[in-house]
Amino acid sequence: MGLCQSEEEKVGSQKSRAIDKEIKQNQSNDERTVKLLLLGAGECGKSTVLKQMRLLTSKTYTADELEAQAKLVFTNIVIEMDHIVKAMPSAHFNFTDPMREHDVHMLTLYIKDMQHKSFHADAAEHVAKLWKDPVIKRLYAERRERNIRDIGDNTEYFFENLDRIAKPDYSPNSMDTLLLRTKTTGIVEVQFEIKKVKFRVFDVGGQRSERKKWIHCFEDVNAIIFIAALSEYNEVLFEDETTNRMIESMRLFESICNSRWFHNTNIILFLNKKDLFEDKIKKENITKAFPEYRGAQNYEETVAFIKQKFEALSNNPKKTFYVHETCATDTNQVQKILDSVISMIIQSNLHKSGLY
């Protein structure tokens, strides 16, 4: 009996060691998987940053993905022109050339049956003629001040490339893909591997209705990349025209950095759309969002002030923020920043897990 018990103990011990080994292996694999959460209010540029991460790893799009993107390019072009045209009455604008009314009529007919059609030269021609009209260009330039809904910052790029996009064999190039405006609904995940470390990056919807999904799902992330659009200091929310977009972004940042779920989580702040901000600040002061600002109306001083406003929102004086000024559509600049950020996260993660 004693011998039998000894054999059972031996077998049990072997199984225990095997289980311990598997647990340690799984723990090691988990420790070498870095989870990143992209956060920010709607229209801040999160989806573009996620696409840049994909480019960083040279992960190409499938034929099906490119086909879906092409359809979205077509849809965005037509719908966004329609939104601009429909904003004319409230702006008290009229076409100087009566032929543009014909283009609007044809565009309306196309939209009614758009789901059954592919984008073709006739539709592109009507959009192109409308885009050349000075009234349309003025309305586009004033889209934010007039709060014209669903007009992206990169719409002009697609209008200017209509000839290429309208060709029968069109397939989005890397710049089209990067600048394509997509609304994130729910949770989007991208996985890639850098320096033998696996990354799982989550992008969640930025509109208010999407935010309830954030905290309870992502308390174990290694780092948060929070994106705020610098250029939104003189804009209001589409879903609430009484709320300044910059102030809303700061409120969200405050709730995230002071959340008990993210008390020990690294937070990287991307002050995005620096190119648009640099141009806009020449025309309108940031006092639109910050009446207390008394500095000069230049890029350096205003950005420094905004940085301080964000950093002051943290209730934890020991919490370190990594702040970068970004233009998410500038591939070279963002790639360098992302490479630096990812290296920092890898080093921090390995240090915490005792692997470095």
UniProtKB/Swiss-Prot annotation:
**Which gene does this sequence derive from?**
gpa-2
Binding positions (GTP): 25, 27-30, 135, 160, 166, 188, 254-255, 257, 310
Function comment: Guanine nucleotide-binding proteins (G proteins) are involved as modulators or transducers in various transmembrane signaling systems. Involved in behavioral responses to P.aeruginosa by controlling the expression of daf-7, a member of the TGF-beta family, in ASJ sensory neurons.
Stretches the record annotates as G1 motif? 17-30
Question: Which regions are flagged for Basic and acidic residues bias?
Answer: 7-25
S-palmitoyl cysteine lipid sites: 4
Classification via Gene3D superfamilies: GI Alpha 1, domain 2-like, P-loop containing nucleotide triphosphate hydrolases
G2 motif, as annotated region: 158-166
* Lineage of producing organism: Eukaryota, Metazoa, Ecdysozoa, Nematoda, Chromadorea
Which Pfam families does the UniProt record give? G-alpha (PF00503)
Ranges for region G3 motif: 181-190
Q: Which residues form the G-alpha domain?
A: 14-338
Specify the species: Caenorhabditis briggsae
Could you tell me which residues belong to the region G4 motif?
250-257
Positions with an attached lipid (N-myristoyl glycine) read: 2
Q: Which cofactor does it need?
A: Mg(2+)
Q: Report the sequence similarity comment from the record.
A: Belongs to the G-alpha family. G(q) subfamily.
Q: Kindly give the InterPro entries that the UniProt entry links to this protein.
A: Gprotein_alpha_I, Gprotein_alpha_su, GproteinA_insert, P-loop_NTPase
Entry keyword set: GTP-binding, Hydrolase, Lipoprotein, Magnesium, Metal-binding, Myristate, Nucleotide-binding, Palmitate, Transducer
Name-wise, this protein is Guanine nucleotide-binding protein alpha-2 subunit
